[in-house]
UniProtKB/Swiss-Prot annotation:
The keyword Electron transport does not apply. Keywords: Host-virus interaction, Inhibition of host innate immune response by virus, Inhibition of host interferon signaling pathway by virus, Inhibition of host MDA5 by virus, Inhibition of host RLR pathway by virus, Inhibition of host STAT1 by virus, Interferon antiviral system evasion, Metal-binding, Viral immunoevasion, Zinc. The gene is P/V. Zn(2+) 2 binds at C201, C213, C215, C218. GO terms for biological process: symbiont-mediated suppression of host cytoplasmic pattern recognition receptor signaling pathway via inhibition of MDA-5 activity; symbiont-mediated suppression of host JAK-STAT cascade via inhibition of STAT1 activity; symbiont-mediated suppression of host type I interferon-mediated signaling pathway. Residues 45-55 have a biased composition (Basic and acidic residues). InterPro entries: Paramyx_V_Zn-bd. This is Non-structural protein V. Residues 28-115 are annotated as: Disordered. It comes from Human parainfluenza 4b virus (strain 68-333) (HPIV-4b). Residues 82-97, 105-115 have a biased composition (Polar residues). The lineage of its organism: Viruses, Riboviria, Orthornavirae, Negarnaviricota, Haploviricotina.
Amino acid sequence: MSFEISVEEIDELIETGNLNIDYALKELGATSQPPPNRPLSQISKTEENNDETRTSKNSASAEAPAHASSPLRSHNEESEPGKQSSDGFSMISNRPQTGMLLMGSDTQSPSPSKTYQGLILDAKKRALNEPRRNQKTTNEHGNTNDTWIFKRGEYSHQERGLGYTESEIKNTIFIPRHRREHSISWVNGRTTISEWCNPCCAPVKSIASVEKCTCGRCPKICELCIRDP
């Protein structure tokens, strides 16, 4: 068995390969056919045109940075104070301009000379000095309830409108009352909560204990312990 290939078979294989290449290039929108033979004068003119094209492209690329730097210069000129563009509008300016869609509302910002602590003190003063207002709230049943806003230093009976005058409040004698205390313990696997009253003059201890009055003015029973066993 001979594996020798004749010249005709080689030519046939080459032609088949060329046809396949031509078909593929045709599908891709190209062609493998060599350009037709042109005279030497036309070839030289084409080469000169190609050289001129390369030269013009190189000069354009060299001039591109100069053109690109011109917007930067105009941008810097607009950012300088007191300078605007020819149409009177600019995106960067030291003063607000009419027609700027990016401008927000004209809000008063805090003075830069004030520190953070100074702003906190101002806020506390406003909160303490502003008048308190009664608020009305509606519960789920549709009933309106009056609620009172707490203000530091005000008496609860004055805030609730019980009719006491300022002089009566100042001359009121403090009456000692009871202090409600609680104890939480774990007994026989169950949590036990105990509560009782101690007189206000008795010291507060970490251990649950029932104390006696030491000033002689505390009541024996108050509204908190009247139902205690």
